[in-house]
UniProtKB/Swiss-Prot annotation:
A motif ('HIGH' region) lies at residues 132-142. It catalyses: tRNA(Arg) + L-arginine + ATP = L-arginyl-tRNA(Arg) + AMP + diphosphate. GO terms for cellular component: cytoplasm. This is Arginine--tRNA ligase. GO terms for biological process: arginyl-tRNA aminoacylation. Monomer.
């Protein structure tokens, strides 16, 4: 339903229940859902069963009293055609044709804004995602973070938040020194397996590429930094470090550009040390009595905030453990005015959540408990040519985001090849691959493991979920082109005043009714997905919507001789096309007119 329809109907039900309950009773929020069986109606409500025990009433008898009250409520009149009590106390509702028609008219009138809320109604939110170490290319796990984080940011923006996207670079510590030593070894002509190869060095072929460019004295730059020119001196470890980090940041920028992800800020971990924020956070915790010394180390009393044991902050060698700069970093988020923060990370970060939150509580800055929120995702396995693509950290072999985009794009064109030949609009050459990777990585809940099947991503049939959804959009465009010619979009305004009874009234087919119901669910689906931090729900919805469209297409011919019926069905398709476009926009996938 439209938000105003939902709120009016929910208010009518809430007041009906409130009138039957004791004044001090705590009542659940009234919600509506789609009945499992379409023949049961358009909406179902289980509030009678939820409150029956508290009201000491029989659920079915209570449901009848609620129905009687709602039927007399002016807010429900014009919305509800009939209500029926089913099973142990479900209330099934059938909406009026006028209410259904109002949904279609709203979609056509609001266009690209259907389902969106006014910007700023919720304030600011910072979404941190990807945040890869600049020690290697973006791998498939980072790709899942990019898909989740960017779709979540879009989703929150649609729900009225001012969204800030941030990438946190871990450009300090042992890993960066290991990167520099790895490149230095390659520059000296060493390779993995040699006796003098550094212990724990990075073994990937990309290290050799960095070393070659360093020796050649090349210049590289990241999107937010100054250019860095290699000295070519293999003994200059500082020059190697700066060049290698910037080289890899540039490579990551290229991958993110291919993936269609833009960040508002790149925050460097190293700046937390140079600005004194890490030391300031530690000293504040010490001063507030939140720490103690034991075995030569400084410990944080994280058990005070629910952790299973206290954690080391500063090791006996004087270095900080990895969660300490994270605490300092999150103080900057709070101080910058982001009272809501969401971190999208791999499930291997689960152990840091309690530590970071405990550190923030210990600082006594007014930060609420449970800050920040986390969306954790599980690993991705890649299948290609019917076999699992083997990865090995030790050997330096893994599947990158770039690999997935290129493989899923089809053909032999590569991103590096486009860059080397100066193709200006190169990201557009990889739209198909980008769309497939984004959609696939959102086609499962974040907390479930996922198998990315490259062969499936290349299929052009209904087995491929992104093709299935995009083809629904393209098929609708084809119908409109048959109706209105090349300039059919300019004629869509003609449908605004169409009589919609052929798709909303009693004569409408079951498939038309089902499609209309699905379109009505879009605003509430977005709201629920945002509240649950669950962008996968949008991908799920789009597959269901495409299925409803294809069922309608197979059941009802659109371009019929009866002008009124034709215009009604075209209006339904125009609304369907619009919602497909809007949903795909939320998850960062294109809506092609032809396929």
């Amino acid at each position: 339903m439209l938000p105003v329809q939902t709120s009016n109907l929910a208010a009518a039900f809430t007041d009906a229940v409130r009138a039957l309950a004791p004044a001090d009773a705590t009542l659940p929020a009234v919600t509506f859902e789609r009945p499992k069986v379409a023949a049961h109606g358009d909406l179902a409500c289980n509030v009678a069963m939820q409150v029956a025990r508290a009201l000491k009433s029989n659920p079915r008898e209570l449901a009848q009293r609620i129905v009687d009250a709602v039927q007399a409520d002016t807010r429900a009149q014009g919305l509800v055609q009939a209500m029926e009590i089913a099973g142990p106390g479900f209330i099934n509702l059938r909406l009026t044709p006028a209410a259904k028609a109002d949904v279609l008219r709203a979609v056509l009138a609001e266009g690209d804004h259907y389902g969106a809320r006014e910007r700023g109604v919720h304030g600011q939110v910072l979404v941190e995602f990807v945040s890869a170490n600049p020690t290697g290319p973006l791998h498939v796990g980072h790709g899942r973070q990019a898909a989740l984080g960017d779709a979540l940011a879009n989703l929150l923006s649609w729900q009225g938040w001012h969204v800030h996207r941030e990438f946190y670079y871990n450009d300090a510590g042992v890993q960066i020194q290991t990167l520099a030593l790895s490149v230095q070894a390659r520059a000296r002509g060493l390779k993995p397996g040699d006796a003098s190869w550094p212990e724990a060095a990075y073994n990937g072929d990309y290290i050799a590429d960095i070393a070659a460019d360093f020796l050649a004295g090349k210049t590289v730059s990241a999107s937010d930094g100054e250019p860095v020119t290699a000295s070519g001196n293999v003994e200059d470890i500082d020059s190697i470090r700066k060049f290698a980090v910037t080289y890899l940041r540039n490579e990551q920028d290229i991958d993110l550009q291919a993936f269609g992800v833009k960040f508002d800020r790149y925050y460097l971990e190293s700046s937390l040390y140079s600005d004194g924020r890490v030391e300031a956070a530690v000293q504040s915790l010490v001063g507030k009595g939140k720490t103690y010394e034991s075995e030569g180390a400084l410990w944080l009393r994280t058990t005070d905030d629910g952790d299973d044991k206290d954690r080391v902050m500063k090791k006996s060698d004087g270095t900080y453990t990895y969660f300490v700069p994270d605490v300092a970093y999150h103080t900057t988020k709070w101080e910058r005015g982001f009272t809501k923060v969401i971190n999208v990370q791999g499930s291997d970060h689960h152990g840091t959540i309690a530590r970071v939150r405990a550190g923030l509580q210990g600082l006594d800055m007014g930060i609420p408990q449970g800050y920040p929120d986390y969306v954790l995702h599980k690993m991705v396995t890649v299948m290609k040519n019917g076999e699992e693509v083997k990865i090995s950290k030790r050997a330096g072999s893994y599947v990158t985001v770039r690999d997935l985009i290129e493989w899923s794009n089809g053909g032999d064109e590569t991103i590096r090849g486009c860059l080397d030949t100066g193709v200006a609009d190169w990201p557009q050459h990889f739209t198909r691959g980008r769309d497939a990777v984004r959609f696939f990585l959102l086609s499962r809940k974040a907390d479930t493991e996922f198998v990315f099947d490259v062969d499936l991503a290349l299929k052009q049939n209904d087995e491929n979920p992104v093709y299935y959804v995009q083809y629904a959009h393209a098929r609708i465009c084809s119908i409109f082109e048959s109706w209105g010619g090349a300039d059919w979009e300019a004629r869509l305004a003609e449908l605004a005043g169409a009589d919609l009874s052929a798709v909303t009234g009693p004569e409408a087919s079951a498939q038309a009714q089902a499609l209309g119901r699905r379109l009505a669910e879009f605003p509430d689906m977005l709201s629920g997905a945002a509240a649950e931090l669950a962008p996968h729900a949008v991908a799920f919805y789009l597959r269901d919507l495409a299925g409803d469209f294809h069922a309608f297409y197979n059941a009802d011919r659109v371009l019929v001789d009866d002008e009124a019926v034709k215009r009604a069905r075209l209006a339904l398709l125009a609304a369907t096309r619009q919602v497909l476009r809007n949903g795909l926009a939320v998850i960062g996938v294109s809506a092609p007119r032809r396929m």
